[in-house]
Amino acid sequence: MDSLAWRVAALLLGLLVECTEAKKHCWYFEGLYPTYYICRPYEDCCGSRCCVRALSIQRLWYFWFLLMMGVLFCCGAGFFIRRRMYPPPLIEEPAFNVSYTRQPQNPTPGAQPLGLPYYTDPGGSGMNPAGNPVAMAFQVQPNSSQGSTAYPPPPSYCNTPPPPYEQVVKTK
């Protein structure tokens, strides 16, 4: 009898589930009177007593939400990685160009001392190139053989190896 009780309980439970299951109640007009029919929960009513299996993906709002969040995350991560791997070039200020006036080919005698023009310290005493070795190193050579006079040649000490440590310490 115990097994009979379990069978009856299972049957009643099955009927309860069948009755409470979410079903779609559909209807359509056949002439002047509506005709009612029932579709399963995963089906949609199609009009004339037929049920069509519904695409449930349109009802899954969380699927679309997660999909859009995934797309936004991938775009953001790609943008971040691209900016880190290929940073934009630094915007540099325009180069500070020092303009100077060239001396005429035939200068008036006594107007300026003979020699090539040179740069000195702006706050300096304006010494002669012979007295200022740094000014000698940065002399401008307007008639250079390179064809471009945009920059002065490198200082002469750039082409020689540095002095030994002992020599530098002894001179101080």
From Swiss-Prot:
Signal peptide per UniProt: 1-22
InterPro entries on file: VOPP1 (IPR026229)
TM helices/strands, residue ranges: 61-81
Annotated localization: Cytoplasmic vesicle membrane; Late endosome membrane; Lysosome membrane
Gene assigned in the entry: VOPP1
Function (record text): Increases the transcriptional activity of NFKB1 by facilitating its nuclear translocation, DNA-binding and associated apoptotic response, when overexpressed. May sequester WWOX in lysosomal vesicles and thereby regulate WWOX role as tumor suppressor.
Example of a GO cellular component annotation carried by this entry: organelle membrane
Entry similarity comment: Belongs to the VOPP1/ECOP family.
PANTHER family, A to Z: VESICULAR, OVEREXPRESSED IN CANCER, PROSURVIVAL PROTEIN 1 (PTHR14971:SF2)
Region (Disordered): 142-172
Domain of life: Eukaryota
Quaternary organization: Interacts with WWOX (via WW domain).
Topological domains annotated Cytoplasmic: 82-172
Feature: compositional bias, Pro residues: 151-165
Main localization category: membrane
Name of the molecule in the record: WW domain binding protein VOPP1
Organism expressing this protein natively: Bos taurus
Keywords associated with the record: Cytoplasmic vesicle, Endosome, Lysosome, Membrane, Signal, Transcription, Transcription regulation, Transmembrane, Transmembrane helix
